[in-house]
């Protein structure tokens, strides 16, 4: 079993902000599979179980994401963990994968690292850097960024679908890494 976590903040206030990339991509994946999330008070998260995967959206706010992840890990005992999250250090349009390593200052990852360890897979979605990091991650994508954002979200969703089918992180990395921003037709 694999635990697949999309990071974000709950409530409409934060819906579709840069920090909610993980939520939005998992929502798109679940919707595309004609499934839905249900709220689990036990794990304080929205859950969806599909094949050998537990899809999770913590409802703890970003800085406490590790609480939901730890609770879910302890209950289901997954062999692998993959986190989908925004990354300020990557330009919008870039998707990279990582196995373990540092958290890059991402508070959701810091929480998971502190409670669970940093030995997990990551799907990193570039959101670019802003002048003020806090304001930037909590802002919505602007109108000019929307086409690229939508294309990148679709690409990331397809990467996760591929991972669910083959359960091979390295194969997903080889097929779906975007080192340069995705080129889209306008």
UniProtKB/Swiss-Prot annotation:
<dbReference type="InterPro" id="IPR001328">
    <property type="entry name" value="Pept_tRNA_hydro"/>
</dbReference>
<dbReference type="GO" id="GO:0072344">
    <property type="term" value="P:rescue of stalled ribosome"/>
</dbReference>
<feature type="active site" description="Proton acceptor">
    <location>
        <position position="19"/>
    </location>
</feature>
<keyword id="KW-0694">RNA-binding</keyword>
<keyword id="KW-0963">Cytoplasm</keyword>
<comment type="function">
    <text>Catalyzes the release of premature peptidyl moieties from peptidyl-tRNA molecules trapped in stalled 50S ribosomal subunits, and thus maintains levels of free tRNAs and 50S ribosomes.</text>
</comment>
<feature type="site" description="Discriminates between blocked and unblocked aminoacyl-tRNA">
    <location>
        <position position="9"/>
    </location>
</feature>
<feature type="binding site">
    <location>
        <position position="63"/>
    </location>
    <ligand>
        <name>tRNA</name>
    </ligand>
</feature>
<feature type="site" description="Stabilizes the basic form of H active site to accept a proton">
    <location>
        <position position="86"/>
    </location>
</feature>
<protein>
    <recommendedName>
        <fullName>Peptidyl-tRNA hydrolase</fullName>
        <ecNumber>3.1.1.29</ecNumber>
    </recommendedName>
</protein>
<comment type="subunit">
    <text>Monomer.</text>
</comment>
<dbReference type="GO" id="GO:0005737">
    <property type="term" value="C:cytoplasm"/>
</dbReference>
<dbReference type="GO" id="GO:0000049">
    <property type="term" value="F:tRNA binding"/>
</dbReference>
<dbReference type="InterPro" id="IPR036416">
    <property type="entry name" value="Pept_tRNA_hydro_sf"/>
</dbReference>
<dbReference type="InterPro" id="IPR018171">
    <property type="entry name" value="Pept_tRNA_hydro_CS"/>
</dbReference>
<feature type="binding site">
    <location>
        <position position="61"/>
    </location>
    <ligand>
        <name>tRNA</name>
    </ligand>
</feature>
<dbReference type="Pfam" id="PF01195">
    <property type="entry name" value="Pept_tRNA_hydro"/>
</dbReference>
<dbReference type="GO" id="GO:0004045">
    <property type="term" value="F:peptidyl-tRNA hydrolase activity"/>
</dbReference>
<keyword id="KW-0820">tRNA-binding</keyword>
<feature type="binding site">
    <location>
        <position position="14"/>
    </location>
    <ligand>
        <name>tRNA</name>
    </ligand>
</feature>
<feature type="binding site">
    <location>
        <position position="107"/>
    </location>
    <ligand>
        <name>tRNA</name>
    </ligand>
</feature>
<comment type="function">
    <text>Hydrolyzes ribosome-free peptidyl-tRNAs (with 1 or more amino acids incorporated), which drop off the ribosome during protein synthesis, or as a result of ribosome stalling.</text>
</comment>
<keyword id="KW-0378">Hydrolase</keyword>
<dbReference type="GO" id="GO:0006515">
    <property type="term" value="P:protein quality control for misfolded or incompletely synthesized proteins"/>
</dbReference>
<comment type="similarity">
    <text>Belongs to the PTH family.</text>
</comment>
């Amino acid at each position: 079993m694999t635990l697949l976590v999309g990071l974000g903040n709950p409530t409409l206030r934060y819906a579709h902000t840069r920090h909610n990339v993980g939520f939005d991509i998992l929502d798109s994946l679940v919707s595309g599979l004609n499934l839905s999330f249900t709220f689990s008070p036990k794990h304080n998260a929205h859950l969806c179980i599909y094949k050998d995967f537990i899809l999770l959206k913590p409802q703890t706010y970003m800085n406490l994401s590790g609480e939901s992840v730890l609770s879910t890990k302890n209950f289901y005992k997954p062999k692998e963990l993959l986190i989908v999250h925004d990354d300020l250090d990557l330009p919008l349009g870039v998707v990279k994968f990582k196995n373990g390593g540092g958290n890059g200052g991402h508070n959701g990852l810091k929480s998971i690292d502190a409670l669970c360890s940093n030995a997990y897979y990551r799907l990193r979605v570039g959101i670019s850097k802003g002048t003020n990091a806090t304001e930037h991650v909590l802002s919505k994508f602007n109108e000019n960024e929307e086409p690229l954002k939508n294309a990148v979200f679709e690409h990331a969703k397809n990467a996760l679908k591929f991972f669910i089918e083959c359960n091979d992180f390295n194969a997903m990395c080889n097929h779906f890494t975007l080192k340069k921003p995705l080129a889209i037709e306008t």
